[in-house]
């Protein structure tokens, strides 16, 4: 219709007005049909196209066979989202037995699958000794070429390639997700149970059967009901199982951060019959499966975790509609859930198994199965190897949204593998993983059939049914023990909930903000402490000093021209939301910065002792030289910078110089390029940072638009002794200046003062 509007003639009324009056009563033309057609051919064509379009539309919607329309809509969606739904002929897939590997004739039902990147660990040697279980070690590009362990089957990259699995085309060479090859190999060689483990876990008492329900049917199966979380609250969709086993202040990797503060024990449980706990998640003593936020904030840098859980707490099941994080370190899979072993390849490394776990739990409900969590089954030793927050980005960004999506998702497929493929495709559409995992899922499912796995049957889903009322007789009470967290050195108390909640809130707010610190003091005695203090909150802590220290990752910079060093840091962390600069004589009370707008500039323009105007005394003094440099730079500024600066300084007489001590300021991402442009304008000029920074800020934006958060900081211009600093400090202020830190003892005194605002800091001293 838009095309028709553009080419349509003007209305007849306007044409009549334009005709001379003498033509109004001219003799009419003879109505010849052929001439009429030639005169109106364009109208006929347009009307004809319109009629055909409308007819086609109604035909597609009203015909009994709507396949054409559905196909059209599907293709439109695919073209918009660049996704292709795999089409698989399941009946054409033939079972292929292993005929080439040295283990072609070997078959056993119970397997332990691990990924190895180093020579065999003592824990892995212990796994080999577990009776009745076969260890399968999966190598990658980081694995030593001469890797060998008696009693274990080792699949190198070359050995994996010879298996001809479809998934090999999609796997990275240097990742633990190559365990997916091992799962298929185990299934091909008779697996009925697969224990998904790592090479740092030691099975307690060396007996998996003592801890897990290895047998679900038959004489050896435990015929007993299992405690189950109550389904009474439909809005409760995820739980922290560590609370049930005695540790309220510990949370598992993959638990949404907004749920960390929920530490109350269950009012009551229900029960479920055993036999369908096809995925069994074990708890790990020592180093449990915790995320980088917990690992980086709940202990000192070199102190290994040694957390213990209650071994006497009963196992607990999850009802449909409620989920729990599941990992690849300590989990038993029964054959009915082998399809759920697939490790995604398009997400960050520390998110792969957790996303797999949530994906698998949702699909498990389609089979009438459920996940159960078991008391401590292994002891994992902490090697004090922190992993970066970025490795978990797909967890902290997406996991809460993923859980909500999975609970709402429904499928109309009639075969289970089609249901799996449908969910994987929709998850790619929603951005939880990419098309790589759609293709990987298709290859995985075909490989499962090829190695002899039988597709499970779908069962009715209970999510859409009215929940059964929980009667008084159905309620089962269990009060978990409250074990002390030994690593904290204190007994846990009720306030831990709000303390952890605050920490998570601060981390969520500043987790993508880079802190840049210039150390005037000796970095050998303070750099690690500053990173420990602020690294809990910010994305990273970049430390600069007048002297470089490669061992401590301290970069060299001159304070007088510190602003010239910042653009390189901006480029290195280009995805950051913003950058806070602070000198080590200024304390940043981050808990009082939450209300500040991270899209605005922050500086101390409202602090009169920090932001000052100086009138140079003569042409030769230092202030006059700096003022001349400012004039020269302003004259070369692009119009938007120059207008801002002159508007901000219009009340001065043109000879005064604006200065700022610049111990603390913030540059948001949207002003990073402006800051860099201004640095380039300065070039090699010897402009002092106390002059350059206020000039930059006044050029980038109007002071009226600065966020006033730093305006209430405690600021004294004279140097402070430690005793005067103690009386100067206020936990209510956004920042405090000055504060002298020259050694570990000074740092401890500072932390004790800051603990008024962040009580968890007392763990560091």
UniProtKB/Swiss-Prot annotation:
Tissues where the protein occurs: Expressed in cells that are expanding or producing secondary cell walls.
Gene Ontology molecular-function annotations: glycosyltransferase activity; identical protein binding
Alphabetical list of Pfam families matching this protein: STELLO
Cytoplasmic side: 1-43
Transmembrane stretches, start-end: 44-64
Entry's EC annotation: 2.4.-.-
InterPro entries: STL-like
Role, per record: Probable glycosyltransferase regulating the assembly and trafficking of cellulose synthase complexes.
PANTHER family for this protein: EXOSTOSIN DOMAIN-CONTAINING PROTEIN-RELATED, GLYCOSYLTRANSFERASE STELLO1-RELATED
Protein name from the UniProt record: Probable glycosyltransferase STELLO2
Species per Swiss-Prot/TrEMBL record: Arabidopsis thaliana
């Amino acid at each position: 219709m838009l095309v028709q509007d553009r080419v349509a003639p003007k209305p007849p009324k306007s044409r009549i007005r334009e005709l001379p009056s003498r033509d109004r009563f001219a003799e009419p033309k003879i109505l010849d049909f052929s001439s009429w057609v030639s005169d109106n051919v364009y109208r006929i064509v347009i009307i004809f196209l319109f009629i055909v379009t409308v007819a086609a539309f109604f035909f597609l919607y009203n015909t009994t066979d709507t396949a054409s329309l559905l196909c059209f809509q599907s293709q439109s969606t695919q073209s918009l989202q660049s996704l292709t739904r795999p089409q698989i002929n399941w009946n054409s897939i033939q079972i292929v037995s292993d005929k080439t590997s040295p283990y072609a004739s070997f078959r056993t039902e119970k397997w332990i699958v691990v990924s190895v990147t180093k020579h065999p660990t003592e824990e892995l040697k212990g796994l080999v000794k577990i009776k009745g279980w076969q260890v399968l070690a999966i190598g990658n590009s980081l694995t030593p070429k001469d890797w060998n362990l008696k009693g274990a089957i080792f699949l190198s990259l070359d050995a994996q390639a010879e298996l001809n699995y479809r998934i090999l085309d999609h796997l990275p060479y240097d990742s633990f997700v190559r365990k997916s090859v091992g799962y298929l190999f185990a299934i091909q060689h008779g697996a009925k149970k697969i224990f998904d483990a790592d090479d740092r876990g030691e099975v307690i008492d060396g007996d998996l059967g003592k801890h897990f329900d290895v047998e679900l049917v038959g004489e050896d199966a435990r015929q007993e009901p299992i405690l189950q979380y109550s389904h009474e609250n439909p809005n409760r969709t995820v739980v922290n199982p560590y609370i049930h086993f005695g540790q309220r202040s510990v949370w598992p990797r993959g638990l949404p951060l907004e749920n960390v503060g929920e530490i109350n024990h269950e009012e009551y449980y229900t029960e479920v019959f055993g036999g369908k706990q096809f995925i069994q998640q074990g708890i790990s003593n020592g180093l449990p499966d915790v995320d980088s936020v917990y690992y980086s904030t709940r202990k000192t840098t070199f102190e290994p975790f040694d957390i213990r859980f209650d071994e006497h707490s009963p196992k607990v099941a999850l009802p449909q509609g409620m989920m729990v994080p599941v990992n690849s370190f300590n989990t038993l899979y029964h054959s009915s859930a082998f399809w759920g072993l697939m490790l995604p390849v398009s997400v960050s490394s520390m998110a792969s198994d957790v996303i797999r776990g949530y994906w698998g739990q949702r699909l498990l409900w389609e089979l009438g199965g459920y996940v159960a969590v078991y008391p401590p089954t292994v002891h994992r030793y902490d090697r004090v190897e922190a992993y970066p927050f970025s490795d978990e980005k797909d967890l902290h960004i997406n996991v809460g949204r993923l859980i909500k999506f999975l609970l709402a998702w429904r499928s109309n497929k009639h075969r289970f593998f089609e249901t799996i493929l449908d969910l994987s495709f929709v998850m790619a559409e929603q951005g939880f993983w990419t098309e790589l995992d759609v293709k990987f899922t298709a290859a995985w499912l075909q490989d499962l059939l090829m190695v002899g796995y039988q597709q499970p049957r779908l069962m009715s889903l209970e999510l859409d049914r009215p929940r059964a009322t929980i009667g008084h007789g159905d309620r089962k009470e269990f009060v978990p023990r409250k074990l002390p967290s030994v690593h904290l050195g204190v007994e846990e108390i009720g306030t831990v909930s709000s303390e952890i909640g605050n920490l998570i809130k601060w981390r969520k707010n500043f987790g993508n903000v880079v802190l840049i610190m210039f150390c005037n003091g000796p970095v050998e005695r303070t750099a690690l402490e500053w990173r420990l203090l602020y690294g809990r909150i910010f994305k990273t802590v970049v430390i600069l000093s007048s002297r470089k220290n490669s061992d401590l990752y301290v970069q060299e910079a001159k304070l007088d021209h510190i602003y010239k060093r910042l653009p390189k840091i901006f480029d290195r962390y280009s995805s950051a939301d913003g950058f806070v600069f602070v000198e080590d004589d200024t304390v940043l009370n981050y808990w009082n910065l939450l209300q500040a707008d991270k899209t605005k500039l922050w500086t101390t323009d409202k602090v009169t002792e920090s932001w000052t105007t100086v009138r140079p005394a003569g042409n030769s003094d230092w202030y006059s030289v700096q003022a001349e440099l400012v004039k020269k730079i302003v004259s070369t500024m692009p119009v938007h910078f120059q207008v801002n600066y002159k508007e901000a300084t219009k009340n001065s007489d043109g000879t005064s110089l604006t200065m700022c001590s610049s111990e603390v300021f913030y540059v948001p991402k949207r002003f990073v390029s402006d800051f860099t442009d201004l640095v380039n304008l300065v070039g090699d000029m010897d402009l002092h940072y106390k002059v350059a920074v206020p000039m930059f800020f006044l050029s980038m934006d109007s002071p009226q638009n600065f966020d006033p958060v730093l305006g209430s900081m405690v600021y004294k211009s004279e140097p402070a002794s430690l005793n005067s600093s103690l009386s100067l400090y206020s936990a209510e202020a956004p920042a405090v200046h000055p504060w002298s830190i020259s050694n570990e003892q000074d740092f401890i005194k500072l932390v004790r003062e800051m603990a008024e605002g962040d009580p968890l800091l007392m763990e560091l001293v």
